[in-house]
């Protein structure tokens, strides 16, 4: 009886008339449209309505988290670079982070189809394109999911409300305007699921290949979870139709044998059908592995096609770059498999429910998943639910999908479609069981019925307990009551519907999806609450100020007047600095800032440890603009757009809302000098002398210094040591070996912070610093007794011990901020050494802003001083490299060409972060590169005039190109073979029909 009902309800591919199902329209321009088309259109507009209600009424469809600083700005840079160079597959980004491997930004859509499509529409601003495409992709998710689920043979109402359930996922909408790569691959994943069905039903792989390719190009990080979900779905779909596949394989084998072997082939076919029919959960190994290979080949073709992105990105991530995250367990990835904790199940219900950083469904998803696993059905029917439960509960999978860095629930978002499909099948099976109950009400004993009902009710009780235990979670606490209400409502709906007499219907309908309806409604309210509670939408006025076209016009105007090779940055408050960290207004603009999950590790180490600039943000991957005037000079920041004048800069132009300041003496991006010190000597200098010396000398490796010293005669050594700048010793320098190198313009002073002991604020002086406890952020004024006359710069350095380690704390001195992140933050910056180098106020007052918390400041030291004399810095920078054609004319923007004239043998010094994949040619001859200033490109240069060519070759680029070529060939072979099989099949079908006609004609004649 159950088998007949299942066949009646779930048999795919047949058109059934159901009560309440929309009929096809046959009038006017609507002719040919079916009820499914109108339902899909309704879901499309419903998605747009959610975007309006949840996001757009509060601001633009973008957030202040990563959207404004990464997704919109980096996509805009990719397009600008393409327009300037015409290079669709670049290797290097000269404009960002001082110069970075462009595959550090591959995560943000370097080759994403939606970004590449924007190249055809230069008249549409990229931020508007990103907003519009995100809205359309979200709406496409709803439509494609409905198209996929409606092919499962489910009740029309079940398909509709399962699609609404999917659309209301908090993760799907929230990340459509926050971290786009979390969800922007979803349309391709849904197309791939349709491609799996098409592959098994029609033996066509084109859709599957293209969908896998699109998913990887859009978000290679989340495509791993997507491929795992695809594989699990493909295995279960194959096992569900195991009988048909076994019979098909036997038929194929039968066609290959001759007539003399027909009896044996028929025997093999009968044996295959018998094993498939009796086992019902397994198929023959030969058939299974054959199907597995046929499925793996198109997936492999899609992966190989994306090699042009995957291999260079992997080389950039694991070949010496930095990457965000906590790090793996001991032993790396392999160590995860031997760690017993990785195999211990964890039942984290919030991994599925109510948080945008998980799958983001309601509690009913957990009920359905457990119900499918616990329920009475064949193993092959609930295998997918069982696999999903294993993926969600075994910690090993969370770590592996996160690359071994940490266990974050975001990597399970690709399982959203298959989980929602299991929810729909759970509801459908409830209808089947109720029909069975109605038709067999008098059969069966009471004890069996009670046990069946308890088994059906058990998932609701388990989820209720899990939700109650999770209510204390930080991000779930504001709306845990919605989760409890959800479980109670769906349980009540289930009981009311389950025990309602089977033959009595509600207005002629059985409504098996009533719990799903209530759950979808509660999920929609939860989504509204979550989006409001996060409150990361950007108000329109703020967005318009950040993207003001006047800024772009000013930068283009400056570039037209001064087309040299330098850097130009914006400095404002914290929100502006974060929003502009990756923003390039004009392709000629270069910045020293970068915010990416991957970056040049040499440059990051130089900023944080060697040079010691301030860290203003809690995320350690944010390498934002600094108002440290010596760092700006070192990095060649010639122009700064700001509201106040930094030390060492003069007003260049006033645009009303902002001003442009020009450096009096900024370093060229590349220059030649012979004023050098060894790396050992440099590292012996304390702060702030380690910053100050780079105004008058460059740092080269010890071995290069020894070569230079050995090549200079003794008399020249003596003359050279007296000449140039190595004259006066610094009385404040702690290491005597560095004393003769330069004369420091800084001297130690005492910074006196007034002590206080109030209810909300306590400041107590200690032996080597201060202990501060404040219940809110406060600003205090400090004095500098004994400050040097004419001092313009203030340097402060101290260590921080945070007494509330789980909470953030910050200290801001004269507008410059240092922040220490709580230890529980995933991307905690670990910034316990606070360094400040700021411009002093005219009256000498120091304003200190202290953040809420309890912390101890140790080894508190203060200096005042001024920049090195102008003649010394000009002498260091006098032999600058002049570019020919800018940074876009050589090798598709992956190289630069310049000329330089060196008076004496010296060194090429740059502020381009060191990377071993650079190739330098001086007058056509390849020259060895080394680390200058401990982290930048440098090389030995002889005297005379030279032509310099510096080219970057992204590692893995050639291998990726060959991989994509192989993938294209494999895809072409698969398509051709499938076409031939279809043609042969149609020819055999035609021959069979002809034989039948001939036989019929013969019988009639006889």
Give residue ranges: language-model regions.
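Start-transfer (signal-anchor) and selected internal transmembrane alpha helices
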Residues: 1-56, 290, 294, 495-499, ...
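Active-site-proximal, structured, solvent-exposed surfaces of multi-pass membrane proteins
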Residues: 16-17, 22, 74, 739, ...
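Membrane-embedded helix bundles of polyisoprenyl
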Residues: 44-48, 134-152, 156-240, 294-319, ...
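Membrane-interface coil-to-helix junctions
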Residues: 47-142, 164-186, 317-322, 330-351, ...
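Extracytoplasmic/lumenal acceptor-recognition loop(s) of multi-pass membrane glycoenzymes
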Residues: 98, 104-107, 520-542, 557-631, ...
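Contiguous transmembrane helix-bundle modules in multi-pass membrane proteins
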Residues: 222, 379-547, 943-981, 985-987, ...
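Perimembrane helix-loop-helix junctions
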Residues: 226-300, 490-495
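Periplasmic/ER-lumenal interhelical loops and adjacent helix-loop junctions
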Residues: 253-254, 291-413, 471-478
